[in-house]
């Protein structure tokens, strides 16, 4: 769907590997099971006719907001090995949002903001893409900053709501090594 590896597919990969299955990120071949995920409704579904599978499972918010990964998969750490071309980590410190913008599906999909346990980082990563929808609305934002500082990696924050940021948060935001501009 975009410039990032698909987190759901990475967790599905870990789940299957933990259960003794062989996992490939496939563009060609015959498989027992094929997973297809898309984040956005407008994303084209490019079903490659060079892939055949006994079972095909499609999912993601681009298909149906009400369907979620089963808990036994959701709790798995991401398997970055299926995306060797990415040299960064994805991270969430919160899910959901305090806003309910009419153009956005986050509140419908994830509910109100809540802190979540950080995921394992990409062992080959050199920066962290923090994908929280509203980083400083997280009641545990300071723990998130501490965690980011402890990694000594550059950070790209994707959700900073300048309408709610206070002086203390601005101070700690300035302590991070930023990879790019902060996304507001």
Predicted regions and their residues:
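Short, charged, surface-exposed secondary-structure boundary motifs
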Residues: 34, 46, 65-72, 83, ...
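Ser/Thr/Gly-rich flexible loops in soluble cytosolic domains mediating phosphotransfer, phosphorylation
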Residues: 55-81
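Conserved acidic residues
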Residues: 31-35, 102, 126-128, 180
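Conserved, mostly hydrophobic/aromatic
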Residues: 16, 97, 101, 130, ...
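Canonical Radical SAM [4Fe-4S] cluster-binding loop centered on the CxxxCxxC motif
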Residues: 8, 84-124
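Short, solvent-exposed loop/turn segments at secondary-structure junctions
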Residues: 2-3, 39-43, 62-65, 97-99, ...
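Conserved SAM/AdoMet-binding glycine-rich loop
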Residues: 123-184
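A short, structured N-terminal alpha-helical element that caps or precedes a catalytic domain
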Residues: 1-58, 63-64
